[in-house]
Amino acid sequence: MQYIAEMNPELNLQTRYFDTADGIRLHAKVCGPNHAGDAPTLLFVHGFPEFWYSWRKQLAEFSKDYRCVAIDLRGFNLSSQPTEVAAYKPALLVADLCAVINELGAPVHAVIAHDWGGAVSWSLAAQHPELMGKFVVLNSPHAITFAHALATDPAQQAASQYMNWLRRQGSEAVLVENDFKRLFDMLGTLSDEERAAYRACWQHGLTGGVNLYRVSPLHPDTPEKPGKAALVVAALKPEQFQVKVPTQIVWGNTDRALLPILLDGIEQHVSDLAVHRIDGAGHWLARENAVEVNQVIRAFLAS
């Protein structure tokens, strides 16, 4: 893709593919020092409805002294896009990241993730701490705090109603309408080059990304299944979600979908935690607040 190369020709982006044991092929962009074998590796994991390109401002910053690998999750952009909902179970996406890291050479210096990429990476950090030295997560809640908020907090329940809409059959067809207007409205102000990049990604298909919502047990109650969110909380075992990897949370406090309450009690589930809140920042802080985000990440990586 030409867009980021035109913005930062010195990045020398390379394309790489990773093949998993269950036949999934994951597309990635790689950049960084030519002596990649000596440079520590950072793995970037995007969310919905984005792809590797969402990290372009971080790639420009950290490729100066790190080998940077930004993947497309299964179901997104140039990675494999199985159509069945069951192919997007969280355990399978965690296994995808394990395969990528093992092929890169475990452990990576850090996993840096956002939104759905963060959800998968929270599980990776809890289940496979040996695969990463550090974990950075941007506006993506821990499963336990998210489940509790969906069950008990009216404001977060209201903010998360979009999840139930996306879970409906045919939601991806609606997202395509009017040149992806709903998705562009969601992402906010973009340049013409950025719009072209996202449009090209979405033209590969949206079903995979939407299937993440369909398969997830974490969503607000529906009229058909009242009380389900509370049942999910009761079924969760906190010890399985305990994170011991040194973790840096970067949180935009004005995110309309993921509210600050999702950080309440997070220290109970992460033993080595730093939290940096950005007032006035929303959900897309890697792009909209890149300077501050990059400063926080760099300081944490060096600590």
Please provide the spans of the model-predicted regions:
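Flexible "cap/lid" subdomain of the alpha/beta-hydrolase fold that forms the substrate-access gate
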Residues: Y3-T15, I24-L26, G32-A36, T41, ...
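Glycine/alanine-rich phosphate-binding loops at beta-alpha junctions
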Residues: A21
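Structural cue for short, hydrophobic secondary-structure segments
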Residues: F44-G47, A70
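Serine-hydrolase catalytic-loop signature spanning alpha/beta hydrolases and amidase-signature enzymes
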Residues: P49-K57, C68
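A short acidic, amphipathic alpha-helical/loop segment
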Residues: K57-Q58, L262-G265, E292
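Active-site machinery of serine-nucleophile hydrolases
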Residues: S63-D72
